[in-house]
């Protein structure tokens, strides 16, 4: 069966899992500004509308230092969380724990400038565009037809030469995947079901996303390879480095297991010899007469 092909596919949020799923399926080939940010204070409908407004506004007021305030509610062991009062977004991956905004802001600002430039160039040159939005299970509410029409109209006004489609996925607690609610209209698809995965983290029950449940929703799509030759070469080098690291880790594990087996064998051999059993190199044993 032929797949629906797009020039550009990008994540609208609401959290990190959307970008992670697109990458796993080969539908996102580069990093973009909305990959790891969210607006949980806005609710589901507010999040997708806010992200759309940011895109059509060409990221005006994005990540300005004077708008960033500490908000430790989303701190992690590795990073400090900051609320951007200009956009309502939470930035949770840009200031390292133990560091400061003053120290880490220049590099983060440069990173976002690079990603925004790439994003806007791809969006401006695309004729068929797919935006994917998957709600974070912790964000209340659902995205409905009115919200999707708002986003499609905003995209169409900002980029009249492109045809846009939105795939939105709501997390509705208690609705099994087999009972998924589906709404399909002109330019959008909306799926609603419960995709929470419960995992224990410290003393809290954390809601994660079961990304395996989304495979059928994304396998119908494909994207043109918009990477430059330099980006493809860089990606090939990264893949090779990851493969080598995996190989080294596997080799180290194999070596450790071999040494462990030898130690166990030597210990058993000595133990048997003390009992009068001769252990040959092949592993057979004969009793001394």
Model region roles, listed by residue range:
Residues 11-82:
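Adenosine ribonucleotide-centric catalytic and binding domains
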Residues 105-117, 141-157, 210-211:
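Well-ordered, non-membrane alpha-helical segments in soluble/globular domains
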Residues 123-124, 155-162:
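Short, conserved loop/helix-junction motifs that constitute active-site signature segments
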Residues 135-137, 164-176:
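Short beta-alpha junction loops
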Residues 228-289:
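Membrane-proximal basic amphipathic "stem/tether" segments
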